[in-house]
Amino acid sequence: MFEKGEETVHSRLFYDNPDYAEQQKVTQESFPTYVPSARVHTFHKFLPEEKFYKSHPEYFALRGDQRLPTQLCLTNPEVLAIVKDSVASLFEQYPQSKVISVSQDDNQQHCQCDNCSKIDEEEGSASGTMIRFVNEVAANFPDKMISTLAYQYTRKPCKTKPLENVLITLTSIECDRSAPIAEKCADFANDLVGWGKLTQNIRI
């Protein structure tokens, strides 16, 4: 909790003033070189609920005894095949784009089926299933970059190293940005160090 008089300082993603952006050495584009329609939180774009949920609930997250269209089941081989095909189609549609996001949707209802849970336990984090899944996608597109999120339940680093063409977008949304992260966001700082041991491709 913040004490009275304290404020959280949030970085701006978009810079309306080009002079200010130049001074700060920040691009005015929030996602340069990305496929325009696949920049972040993309799972629902690859497997839309309205297209797949009724006929293939097994493609989606198991929570308790229910399949929910909140996230994907990342150990289902058919899900992997569909995502690979979707990524290929988008790169064909936007040949100048160099990066696409293959990333969780904006909720914490990730799959807890036996297969996904086993991997997450082995990896020490739910990022385990994510990185293994994203690596499988990235292996098909060696000349492109596949971005994914280290966010909420996937922020803690796993054991599997991302491939060289995988970009980790590490999110500091929970942090108080009015002070150095080592002072007021130690968990994030530790996660940053952990991911840094696995890859040099980190975007914050």
PLM regions: where:
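Feature activates predominantly on carbohydrate-active enzymes
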Residues: 1-142, 147, 167-171, 193-204
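Generic local-structure boundary detector
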Residues: 85, 111-113, 155-159, 177-181
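Short, glycine/charged-enriched secondary-structure capping and boundary segments
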Residues: 116-117, 161-163, 183
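Substrate-binding cleft/loops of secretory-pathway carbohydrate-active enzymes
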Residues: 147-177
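Alpha-helical scaffolding within the catalytic cores
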Residues: 149-159, 182-194
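Metal-dependent peptidase/peptidase-like ectodomains
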Residues: 172-173, 178-191, 201
